[in-house]
């Protein structure tokens, strides 16, 4: 399959053009499982950025990866009905659920819906990519409360460490440049995520690979207070 034809198909998936996607799949069923032979790199990224969903296409991504990134349950269901694999990994080891957990834009209901759908058909909420990152780590880092809740409801481990030994709670208490972390909205999301993780069994005494407890990773007195109280205030 020509790369240009595959990229055009991905554009249709991202745009949510179900009729065109259906026609392409009927003509070329392999599109449902084809892994992208190209993708964003440090040298060339612009051509693989989809502004509609604020997400890059990476080598190894399937159409389902991009439907998940678009938070499109209808498109994900269409692709699955044509044989797409909800456990497909790209070259970085990321699965569609990893992309669904990213909070690149504010569509909480749609994001939660696609996460719930993927888990319902067999996506593994604790799957890790090549860097040891699970979907919950992504959702926490991007301050996506709806995604965090959907993942926890679907069986994500609130104490799962990444390769650095950081648990979701370690990540939740740190400042992140994503999603406008300095805004009032982001701070509220952060507080609610911390409270939710604590409710679901996360422990402030857990240590990362360097022996640092969550308390020590907290970047402000406000966050340390939340940890002590065990709730958002």
Place the predicted regions along the sequence by residue.
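Ankyrin-repeat and related helical/solenoid repeat scaffolds used for protein-protein interactions
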Residues: 146-149, 153, 158-210
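Ankyrin repeat domain, specifically the short helix-to-loop turn at the C-terminus of the second helix
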Residues: 25-31, 77-85, 116-124, 149-157, ...
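Conserved ankyrin/ankyrin-like repeat signature
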Residues: 20, 74-75, 113-114, 146-147, ...
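Ankyrin repeat A-helix N-terminal signature
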Residues: 11-16, 54, 66-72, 99-111, ...
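Ankyrin-repeat boundary/"N-cap" motif
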Residues: 3-9, 34-63, 89-103, 128-134, ...
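Leucine-rich solenoid repeat scaffolds
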Residues: 198-199, 203-232
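Eukaryotic tandem repeat interaction scaffolds
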Residues: 112-113, 124-164
